[in-house]
């Protein structure tokens, strides 16, 4: 399965800055009934720990245009508490995905927009995103416009 263009468009426009890789994993489980093939312990450009989820041809971080760097086994010790916290969240999500979605307002909104927004509207949002990025316009402005 390839990365879903509708989901990517919504994540980069209407939900820019609101979602995490954990949210993306939960959305993929809920919408597509897919579990990740692999879990990758990573850090972002600021050194903040994040779990990335690998699927057949993409990673959860790609939905967010988030460049993550995998960490080594030695670095895991430094991030042990964050790893434990995020793995606990993963277990909670996997245990009852529908309950997790129901109790997370931004994910409920995302799924509602994903299911109800027309392909035309999502295509228009994607086109706005491409034009704005080509002109160097900030993501926050794009989010407000969509």
Curated annotation (Swiss-Prot):
Membrane-related topology note: Single-pass membrane protein
Induction: Expressed in the late phase of the viral replicative cycle.
Major location (coarse): host cell
UniProt entry tagged with the keyword Transmembrane: yes
InterPro entries on file: Poxvirus_H7
One Pfam assignment: Pox_H7
GO cellular component, one term: membrane
Compartment list: Host membrane; Host cytoplasm
Transmembrane segments: 10-32
Cystine pairs: none
UniProt keyword list: Host cytoplasm, Host membrane, Late protein, Membrane, Transmembrane, Transmembrane helix
Similarity comment text for this entry: Belongs to the orthopoxvirus OPG112 family.
Function: Contributes to the formation of crescents and immature virions (IV). Interacts with phosphatidylinositol-3-phosphate (PI3P) and phosphatidylinositol-4-phosphate (PI4P) lipids in order to form virion membranes. Mechanistically, mediates proper formation of OPG125-hexamers, and hence the honey comb lattice and spherical immature virus.
Designated name of the protein: Late protein OPG112
Organism in which the protein naturally occurs: Variola virus (isolate Human/India/Ind3/1967)
